[in-house]
């Protein structure tokens, strides 16, 4: 039997249905009137599913073409038609070459996906009946769905340009297969304006900086198509060889990012529309729907982390395919071991981790037993509080307890130091309150200075895991100054909703700095990172600080004293020995002293900020300086608690938890090729939301060595670690209404990604690369002098590694 082509109606078919002759009845159909009603309508039409799918996706764009990167942004729409599946809302094209709509119906043949509506002719077609359907049949659902789609079309086309996308016919015109070359005749990436979709300046400013991130443009080429080969080399201790896996097609958000970056590099006039990318992001993070006021740093987190999740899923799928997709039931123990080993290394190869993700190490040392705990966590940016000069109000001593009076006397010796300590206390992400040695730890008395526990290895393996789940501290959001002002209550509610939405996926935390949720106060004293004496003696030029631990020698001697005071005659064999020769005690103290000094040692000389300095370096100095955990903010030391319990083993009473004074420091232990610094200008002060407008100086060339651990990966002691500024996100205005803009540096790419860190000894002679700074505010693009850049009110700073 000859099948009629969908929607290929003769002239007679365009007349009224009353005058239209009946079509030949399909012998397999039970319809009473051919072409008018269909028995599949009741099972193949689901209005609620269509509404959910259509409102959450880009209108009139083939989903499969978008996934396969067969579309480009900013171009006139092609002549092909889009058919909407009335079962699930899938939008597919009817091109002769691909027929995505037909393939969708065939893929879901068992579940009725056979009825579609054309977004061009508004005609319904049943693939099972192979006939056009009447939208006025005895089923109301079909007519209601058509009405919804027509209203949705009116909404989508009323405020948007017809120049959205077009099919890509010649990929070779803009994709250069040679790494390191630009698709145009120059190696410089041009700067184009980006259309504001409605309160999306926060998005546009970030995308301008990402489009000028050369390494991102290079590495994303690897995910542009299905079948990319990836070589995974596990650690030598696994006794496994390298494995080459074939990756499946990239996920929608990563595909949309690739298309956007390509459109930004295309030569041509006019701004670029980010609609495809923005809509895909809204699918991952619904909080950005509705075109409300938002925050650039939050946007950057959601965007990078969502792409990272997609790429991790893609890499895992490639590894499982290499092992013939084993399951928990079918795989043997050896296969499980190999899959786990390759997966552990493979997930680290996603392009987000390779470009933006670094590592920080938080070191905490108990002042009583000198047990050292370390916590390593990944970051995609470092949030730095801006130091504000404030006049501290006098505190009534009568309202303080004993510990409060001790703390007050400690801080009264130096007002300036106390003010800085207050800022330092607010800058810490980790509270000393009830910090336990559940953290991955190294202990001089148990494992030796170089032994790392298995818990630490787990922390390093599980990317995106830190001490807590991701949480952003930015309260409220900002938008264009031409937009309507939002009240403080709305901003507060927006921040509250963010906390619940942040659980949508495992997330790499930013190294955010916020105050402890406890109402207890900790006294934090900023010390030079070159001071390593466990007694924490202060600089002789300053007023001496009272000791925070008894000067009775080492930990063993303190334990001897404690045992003698308790009057315990018998000790169990698992307690530390209390009798040593003087030589053994001396050797132990020397070894411990060296280990403790190394734990708090930086890569090179520490940075010393000048008086009243407010710069990126002074903020980093504050972030990485040593602080004391004491008073009501002491450390809950499990090591001391265990020792107390062993000493009281013969007693029926359970030893109380031991809280001790401690030292804590956060240092960078692994640097990514691109370091993003977030200046915390927005925060909550009491019941109010406020913005810090103080200018922060930032260098064009930043040396991060003073803020890196001495054990920082791939770096030698005493080296300079230079990073060059290439992008800024600026916020102007207030909390109620403001505007985001970008400054980007157009420059020649330094080198290919595989050449990074392969050279050494050339850091001293490095200088910032030459280039032209460009100011971009949505569609406004203009070149600016360097002086204007340095005077901007920076919110996000993008630095790239220099060799």
UniProtKB/Swiss-Prot annotation:
InterPro entries: Papain-like_cys_pep_sf (IPR038765), Peptidase_C19 (IPR050164), Peptidase_C19_UCH (IPR001394), USP_CS (IPR018200), USP_dom (IPR028889), Znf_RING/FYVE/PHD (IPR013083), Znf_UBP (IPR001607). The active site is at 201 (nucleophile), 739 (proton acceptor). It holds the Pfam family zf-UBP. This is Ubiquitin carboxyl-terminal hydrolase 45. Zn(2+) 2 binds at residues 62, 65, 93, 100. Disruption phenotype: Morpholino-treated larvae show a reduction in eye size and significantly fewers green cone photoreceptors compared to the wild-type. Moderate to severe eye morphological defects, with a defective formation of the retinal structures. Its EC number is 3.4.19.12. It catalyses: Thiol-dependent hydrolysis of ester, thioester, amide, peptide and isopeptide bonds formed by the C-terminal Gly of ubiquitin (a 76-residue protein attached to proteins as an intracellular targeting signal).
């Amino acid at each position: 039997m000859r099948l009629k082509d969908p929607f290929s109606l003769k002239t007679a078919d365009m007349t009224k249905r009353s005058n239209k002759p009946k079509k030949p009845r399909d012998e397999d159909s039970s319809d009473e009137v051919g072409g008018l009603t269909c028995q599949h309508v009741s099972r193949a039409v689901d209005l609620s599913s269509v509404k959910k799918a259509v409102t959450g996706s880009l209108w009139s764009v083939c989903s499969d073409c978008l996934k396969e990167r067969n579309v480009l942004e900013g171009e006139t729409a092609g002549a092909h038609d889009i058919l909407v599946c009335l079962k699930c809302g899938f939008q597919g094209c009817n091109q002769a070459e691909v027929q995505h709509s037909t393939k969708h119906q065939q893929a879901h043949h068992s579940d009725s996906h056979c009825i579609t509506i054309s977004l061009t002719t508004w005609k319904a077609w049943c693939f099972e009946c192979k006939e056009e359907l009447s939208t006025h049949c005895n089923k109301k659902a079909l007519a209601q769905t058509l009405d919804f789609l027509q209203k949705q079309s009116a909404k989508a086309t009323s405020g948007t340009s017809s120049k959205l996308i077009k099919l890509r016919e010649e990929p070779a015109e803009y994709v250069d297969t040679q790494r390191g070359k630009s698709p145009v005749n120059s190696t410089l990436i041009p700067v184009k304006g980006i259309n504001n979709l409605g309160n999306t300046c926060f998005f546009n400013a970030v995308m301008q900086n990402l489009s000028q991130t050369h390494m991102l443009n290079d590495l994303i080429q690897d995910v542009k198509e299905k079948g990319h080969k990836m070589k995974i080399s596990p650690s030598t201790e696994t006794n496994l060889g390298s494995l080459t896996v074939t990756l499946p097609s990239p996920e929608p958000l990563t595909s949309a990012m690739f298309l956007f970056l390509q459109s930004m590099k295309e030569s041509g006039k006019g701004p670029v529309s980010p609609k495809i990318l923005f809509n895909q992001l809204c699918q991952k993070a619904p909080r950005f729907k509705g075109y409300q006021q938002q925050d650039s740093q939050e946007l950057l987190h959601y965007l990078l982390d969502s792409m990272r999740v997609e790429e991790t899923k893609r890499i895992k799928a490639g590894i499982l395919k290499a092992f013939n997709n084993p399951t928990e039931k079918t795989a043997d123990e050896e296969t499980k071991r190999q899959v786990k080993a390759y997966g552990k290394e493979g997930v680290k190869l996603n392009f987000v981790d390779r470009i933006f993700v670094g590592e920080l190490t938080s070191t905490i040392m108990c002042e009583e037993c000198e047990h050292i705990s370390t916590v390593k966590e990944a970051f995609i940016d470092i949030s730095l509080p801006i130091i504000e000069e404030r006049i501290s109000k006098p505190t009534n001593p009568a309202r303080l307890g004993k510990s409060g009076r001790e703390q007050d006397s400690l801080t009264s010796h130096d007002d300036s130091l106390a003010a800085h300590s207050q800022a330092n206390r607010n800058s810490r992400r980790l509270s000393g309150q009830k910090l336990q040695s559940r953290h991955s730890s190294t202990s001089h008395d148990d494992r030796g200075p170089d032994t790392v526990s298995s818990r630490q290895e787990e922390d390093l393996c599980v990317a995106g895991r830190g001490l807590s789940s991701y949480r952003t501290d930015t309260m409220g959001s900002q938008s264009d100054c031409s937009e309507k002002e939002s009240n403080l209550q709305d901003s507060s509610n927006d921040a509250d909703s963010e906390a619940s939405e942040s659980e949508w996926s495992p997330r790499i935390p930013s190294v955010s700095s916020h105050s402890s949720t406890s109402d207890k106060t900790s006294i934090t004293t900023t010390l030079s990172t070159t001071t390593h004496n466990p007694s924490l003696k202060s600089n002789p030029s300053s007023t001496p600080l009272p000791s925070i631990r008894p000067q009775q020698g080492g930990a063993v001697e303190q334990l001897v004293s404690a045992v003698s005071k308790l009057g315990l005659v018998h000790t169990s064999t698992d307690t530390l020995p209390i009798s040593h020769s003087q030589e053994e005690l001396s050797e132990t103290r020397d070894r411990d002293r060296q280990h403790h000094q190394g734990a708090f040692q930086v890569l090179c000389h520490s940075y010393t900020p000048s008086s009243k300095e407010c710069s990126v370096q002074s903020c980093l100095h504050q972030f990485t300086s040593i602080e004391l955990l004491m008073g009501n903010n002491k450390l809950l030391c499990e090591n001391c608690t265990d020792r107390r319990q062993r000493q009281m083993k013969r007693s029926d009473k359970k030893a109380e938890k031991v809280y001790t004074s401690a030292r804590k420091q956060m240092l960078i232990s692994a640097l990514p090729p691109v370091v993003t610094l977030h200046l915390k200008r927005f925060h909550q002060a009491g019941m109010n939301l406020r913005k810090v407008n103080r200018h922060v100086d930032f260098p064009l060339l930043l040396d991060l060595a003073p803020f890196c651990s001495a054990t920082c990966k791939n770096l030698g002691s005493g080296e300079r670690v230079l990073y060059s500024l290439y992008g800024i996100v600026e916020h102007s205005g207030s909390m109620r209404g403001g505007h985001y803009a970008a400054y980007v540096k157009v420059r020649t790419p330094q080198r290919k990604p595989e050449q990074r860190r392969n050279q050494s000894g050339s850091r001293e002679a490095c200088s910032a690369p030459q280039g032209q700074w460009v100011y971009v505010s949505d569609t406004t693009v203009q070149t600016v002098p360097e002086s204007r850049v340095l005077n901007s009110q920076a919110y996000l700073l993008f630095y790239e590694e220099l060799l």
